[in-house]
Amino acid sequence: MASISTTTWLYRGQVCTDSGKSSNCIVQRRVKCGFPLKTLHAGITSRDRSLRHCIKCKKEDGDGDVSEGSKKSEEGFEYVTVERHPYHSYMDSTSGKLEPASGARASIPGEDYWPEGTSSRVRAARAPQPAGESSSFPSYGKNPGSRRKKNRKATEENVTVETNDEVSDSEDSSEEEENDSSDGFVTYKNEFEREEEETGFELDKKLGRPHPFIDPTKKKQIEKTLTSDESWWNWRKPEKEQWSRWQRRRPDVETVFLKAMAETGQVKLYGEEPTLTETSLYRARRHLFKEERLQAERERLAKEGPMAFYSEWVKAWKRDTSREAVQKHFEETGEDENTQLIEMFSHQTDREYRIMMGTDIRIKRDPLAMRMREDQIKQIWGGDPVYPTINYIQDPNAVMDFRGPDFHEPTPNMLSYLKENGKVISREMHEALLTKEKTEQLEVPDMDDAMAQAVDIGENDDDEDDADVEKDDEKVPRNWSVLKETPELRTAKPKPKKEGRMSLDEAVDDAENLTDFLMDFEEETDP
């Protein structure tokens, strides 16, 4: 390093001293030391003029800037100022390692990609330290508005700020900043009063503290459960409006649980069936409701004791399970409470154990689900799981429709709904309609001469047989096989013969049963 007599510099892998050759060494830095330094002469060669930019790390006073500016013009160096980051690395909570705060490996995105609210928090964290001294301890939000401009006057009288006469420029600039900041704000008269009013529920809601869902001062208590006809939304029932009847959810996990909670008294419903609004509110808070039930179970276990608490799941245990009986049994036989519990659980069936413990002993069972009735269980888990016939998986994010007054009505039965609208009739009505219908009369047209001549197999060549055939079958019907089975249709009126040329469709209709006639005729003529 440097001694007092001579100064040694290590620059770009070369050692330079003031006594040695200094033509290959360029120094652009001020060194502040506690001992005097000799003047260092730096020579510049033509090779050094084409060097890269020098980076200026910190500003000096104004005189230094002027001299450096002249140096820039003389020596041809361009100074580039780089704003340094407030910190070089930080502890990333995701990876648990030190991450760089800037550069290609930095995991902090730009401000454009920050989530909502991050910019304001960063801006608040970068706020300068207040100049004055606090005369009291912080209230942590208990008296809001205490730091406003109206209340600042009282604290400013007690604060004495020591200023230094030497730094006059910084004083002027700070005064100008204070004036600018005071001029930039507008204070309304009722702002302080509004801040004072925000206490309790409003303040908790604003600051994000835990608060009830509805303001306790404005919440109306439910006196009694109303029927569906007495509810306020049922004031007018449309006669033929069918869409609202389908707004009721089918009984699934949420509706059945909510109705069971209303039966146990944990919540109160406005009607007989839970509405869509009540179901969505329960879905958002079902974890809190379960925690309430588990807390009630823990309190009951501490109050009654484990013997009385767990005897609910051992039906075969008929002894007294009160605390007095357990203590008396301990005094008589010397068996403590754990031994009596083991004795009681030895009488527990497999089904009772599965209901009490569930599939995983680490997961606390829901007391409401453990004590559900059989009909409630069938409403949730009934039917075929492969092809569900009772309960279907419903969309939890379905958009609710509150247009009608009776959206809370239960879903109607599909068959009765179709019967009401005349879309479906019963089997008895169908058979009655069939008996009333007349038998359809089939019209038998005359056979054309050309068609009769075309049907000739050639087996009967005798003239006598031909004459008999002409007498018997003077009028050959079109659907011969049908007339053979139902001879009463032969008396029907013949179809009027069309004159003139026939279209293609009419010709096809006229000859549709020709093949049937030929096949039937062939069966009769077989030997």
Curated annotation (Swiss-Prot):
Mostly expressed in cotyledons, leaves, stems and flowers, but barely in roots. Its main location: plastid. It comes from the Eukaryota. Residues 1-30 form a transit peptide. Keywords: Chloroplast, Nucleus, Phytochrome signaling pathway, Plastid, Stress response, Transcription, Transcription regulation, Transit peptide. GO terms for biological process: plastid transcription; positive regulation of DNA-templated transcription; positive regulation of red or far-red light signaling pathway; positive regulation of thermomorphogenesis; protein catabolic process; red, far-red light phototransduction; regulation of plant organ morphogenesis; regulation of transcription by RNA polymerase II. Disruption phenotype: Seedling lethal without exogenous carbon sources. Decrease of total chlorophyll content as well as a decrease in the chlorophyll a:b ratio. Absence of grana thylakoids. Altered expression profiles of plastid genes. Disturbed expression of many PIF target genes, associated with the accumulation of PIF1 and PIF3 failing to be degraded in the light, and leading to long hypocotyls. Impaired in phytochrome (both PHYA and PHYB) responses, especially to red and far-red light, such as hypocotyl growth inhibition, proteolysis of phytochrome A and phytochrome-interacting transcription factors. Residues 1-115 are annotated as: PHYA-interacting region 1 (PIR1). Residues 485-504 have a biased composition (Basic and acidic residues). A motif (Required and sufficient for transcriptional transactivation activity and to trigger PIF proteins degradation) lies at residues 512-520. It is found in: Plastid, Chloroplast; Nucleus. Residues 252-352 are annotated as: PHYA-interacting region 2 (PIR2). GO terms for molecular function: transcription regulator activator activity. A motif (Nuclear localization signal 2) lies at residues 235-242. InterPro entries: PTAC12. A motif (Nuclear localization signal 1) lies at residues 204-211. Residues 163-181, 458-471, 506-527 have a biased composition (Acidic residues). GO terms for cellular component: chloroplast; chloroplast nucleoid; nucleus; plastid-encoded plastid RNA polymerase complex. Induction: Regulated by light at the post-translational level; constitutively expressed at transcript level, but accumulates in response to light (e.g. red, far red, blue and white light) at protein level. Induced by cytokinin (e.g. trans-zeatin). Residues 89-188, 458-527 are annotated as: Disordered. Component of the transcriptionally active chromosome (TAC) complexes. Interacts with PTAC14 and PTAC7. Binds directly to PTAC6/PAP8 in the nucleus. Interacts with MED14. Binds to SL1/MTERF3. Binds to photoactivated phytochromes (e.g. PHYA and PHYB) via their photosensory domains; these interactions stimulate its light-mediated accumulation. Associates, via its N-terminal region, with phytochrome-interacting factors (PIFs) including PIF1, PIF3, PIF4, PIF5, PIF6, BHLH72/PIF7, UNE10/PIF8 and PIL1. Binds to RAD4. Associates with MRL7/RCB. Involved in plastid gene expression. Acidic transcriptional coactivator necessary for the transactivation of many PIFs target genes (class B genes), particularly during the regulation of hypocotyl growth. Plays dual opposite roles in regulating hypocotyl growth, preventing it in red and far-red conditions, but promoting it otherwise. Required in the nucleus for the initiation of photomorphogenesis mediated by phytochromes (PHYs) (e.g. This is Protein PLASTID TRANSCRIPTIONALLY ACTIVE 12, chloroplastic.
